[in-house]
Amino acid sequence: MIDTHDITGLILAGGRGSRMGGVDKGLQNFRGLPLALHTLMRLQPQVGDVMINANRNLAAYESFGVPVWPDGLADYAGPLAGFLTGLERCETPWLLTVPCDTPLFPPDLAARLAQAATREGADIAMAAAPEADERDGTVRVRTQPVFCLLRVTLLESLVRFTQGGGRKIDRWTEQHACAVVAFDQPGDDPHAFYNANTLAELHALEGLGHR
């Protein structure tokens, strides 16, 4: 069994924000708070500790009261660079990654991923959620690879993968035992994994379910 205090949460806020015009996405306003702070408040009850991965405006993120660490890899290398930073700094057996731009993520995310990892003896547990295909509207359950519960012993594997030039999450996670948890049950918020890539999408998210 994985206890809450066995998990450190990592908020991924280190991206370029290119589709938002290059702004620091985690500091954009959502319901009166910076996105990353809203994410922090949603994540804190689910885990033992929290830290933030950011590459700009570090003092602003530090004002939220948790440790802030930039990427160790150069040139905005993507979410795996954040994973790597988190695993290097994590002092608990498990690390839970959450992006800063998906503010409605489930309040039981950590618990359900931890249950699946325990049940399946997996090194990774990854969220999945229903998504409508843009071409034909068909709803399929798709993995959400930035929502990952990772065993910290995976650090060495990720170092090797990134040193070899690997940058895609799924190419790395497929090398390990990975449990996939579908958040498509009755009572699950259908908007839980909606993310904001543009300011218009962020404003649209503000009007969705308050959970």
UniProtKB/Swiss-Prot annotation:
CDD domains: MobA (cd02503). Its EC number is 2.7.7.77. It catalyses: Mo-molybdopterin + GTP + H(+) = Mo-molybdopterin guanine dinucleotide + diphosphate. It is found in: Cytoplasm. Keywords: Cytoplasm, GTP-binding, Magnesium, Metal-binding, Molybdenum cofactor biosynthesis, Nucleotide-binding, Transferase. One of its GO terms (molecular function) is GTP binding. It holds the Pfam family NTP_transf_3. GO terms for biological process: bis(molybdopterin guanine dinucleotide)molybdenum biosynthetic process. Mg(2+) binds at D101. GTP binds at L12, A13, G14, K25, N53, D71, D101. It comes from the Bacteria. The keyword Magnesium applies. It is an enzyme of class 2 (transferase). Its cofactor is Mg(2+). The keyword GTP-binding applies. SUPFAM superfamilies: Nucleotide-diphospho-sugar transferases (SSF53448). GO terms for cellular component: cytoplasm. Transfers a GMP moiety from GTP to Mo-molybdopterin (Mo-MPT) cofactor (Moco or molybdenum cofactor) to form Mo-molybdopterin guanine dinucleotide (Mo-MGD) cofactor. Belongs to the MobA family. The N-terminal domain determines nucleotide recognition and specific binding, while the C-terminal domain determines the specific binding to the target protein. Monomer. This is Molybdenum cofactor guanylyltransferase. It comes from Acidovorax ebreus (strain TPSY) (Diaphorobacter sp. (strain TPSY)).
